[in-house]
């Protein structure tokens, strides 16, 4: 049986590849880029999938890794499924592409058990290890928390037949259609019992029940995505229980006193049993809970989002993370100074506890989507001052349900009237109204009519009309846009405006990739320049938001985009916003940002565009022989560099057969080959694009 363990490389990856660990974790970096791919109700599960994939826990099986990636893909809107790529170039190779089709995460699991996570130039390595040699009989069960054997092998021998009888009967009693799943689980339990593996993962096997007796020695039990209505008595030595995606599971049995981790999200739980005193990690999001039991003193992480809670119990002093968004909370209990992350967005909070101001400077607080007044927020800003606490909010206020109009009616308000004898342009949108997320897009169109742009910009209606015309002709772009609309129906005008900007950006990239600029290279470069400017502005906005104690990220981003629209020639950006005054962005910030973007573009755009996916697509169509020759050379360069590093680094250091060192030089060889590819591409791009790449801005 394979397990995963974290490893310390014998040769430092940073020393060979020159990579430094990012300030944010890989899953945080990736989530920021792909959040728009998912419906909001799937946010937490998608984030948990990412965390497990980036930091696999001991005991996770290769099949479970593959299923987690497939699950992540299934959680997206259909239009973004292709950005989550499974089994790419091999059996166990995966990657995630951002909205611009740029790779932001890759995960490789090879036959030797090497598990590598690559994210934005940083790599993290893990190993699969064999707990017992093939054919070797395990002489004792897994160690308990104290390091002692929970049960000797002689007891196993005496009890094995008894357990097998229970499991065999359970397998024979399977209802129609459930026999294959039960057979697989019985085999897994037998292997678990015979080999002493402490981890039992029953997988998504379509189970309606589990046998009355489980392997007694297990310390980790994983039961994902089945049809269970109840659980049997749990083994006394259980330390971790993960039971998720069982939508008929309404309650849990008594929990073992030594349980340290309980993940029971995406079920139908109406209540929780008494929690063990040593429980440190509790995740019960997306259930039907209306109240919580007393919290154990050892609790460090609490996730209760997506329930029907109106209040929370007293929180333990050691709590570090609390996620309780998407509930009905009207108040919060006192907060411990050690709390590092608090997310209570999308509740009904009208006031906040005084203890919130006593959190450490490293704390992050999310209050988005609560009916907090501007006066309350301003008072909070004055209180926290320069404490370093970062509080995120938005100007949306409480969510008010709003019924979507038929899509063709919402579209008709933006299109010009048909001439006599012509069919109304909006008529063809009746069929589009049956497509996924069409109702959300209808709401977006109606929300846009309430924005400052609609009220003050005479050309805004014509811009939207032109956009709708292309959407009507392009099913692929329409699907992506409709999917993005589900996150754009906020009651905050500026959030809808920001979402429109994101949709416009996707439109620009989509047009470039499908060939619109194959015969208009100047237009291709202009689109690339706009993407570069927006990316640079986003980084500037992120840095500015990081300096603000009370921050609405969207207002900060939108402030830079709107106010610099003309000076930076941003065609995808609108000219108006409502809440600039609460953004925290000053005139001097805007002046500095304009200069920073123009300077960066003059010096760095010609290098940046070499890695831009739409440019590669154009070159592959216009000069396929030369472009593909560069790709083939990249593969050859990788192989040559790997062999050279193997001889010069591994052999000379005595590290032959060291899998961590081999993986490290592999990353280094890949980076070297990519650099050679880009160097070769530069000459081709200079030849094809010519003067279009000269410095755009004249600076004093």
From Swiss-Prot:
Q: What regulates the activity here? A: Exists in an autoinhibited state in the absence of substrate protein, due to interactions of the leucine-rich repeat domain with the catalytic domain. Is activated upon binding to a substrate protein.
Q: A single GO molecular function, which one?
A: ubiquitin-protein transferase activity
Q: Species name for this entry?
A: Salmonella typhimurium (strain 14028s / SGSC 2262)
Q: Where in the cell is it found?
A: Secreted; Host cytoplasm; Host nucleus
Give TM segment ranges: none
Region named E3 ubiquitin-protein ligase catalytic domain? 404-700
EC number(s) on file? 2.3.2.27
Matching InterPro entries: Leu-rich_rpt, LRR-bact_E3_ubiq_ligases, LRR_dom_sf, NEL_dom
Q: Gene symbol?
A: sspH1
What this protein is called in its record is E3 ubiquitin-protein ligase SspH1
- Region annotation (Linker) ranges: 396-403
Active site (UniProt):
492
Which major enzyme category is it? transferase
**Which SMART domains does the protein's record reference?**
LRR_BAC
Query: So what does mutating residue 492 to A actually do?
Result: Abolishes ubiquitination and subsequent proteasomal degradation of host PKN1
| PTM remark | Ubiquitinated in the presence of host E1 ubiquitin-activating enzyme, E2 ubiquitin-conjugating enzyme and ubiquitin.
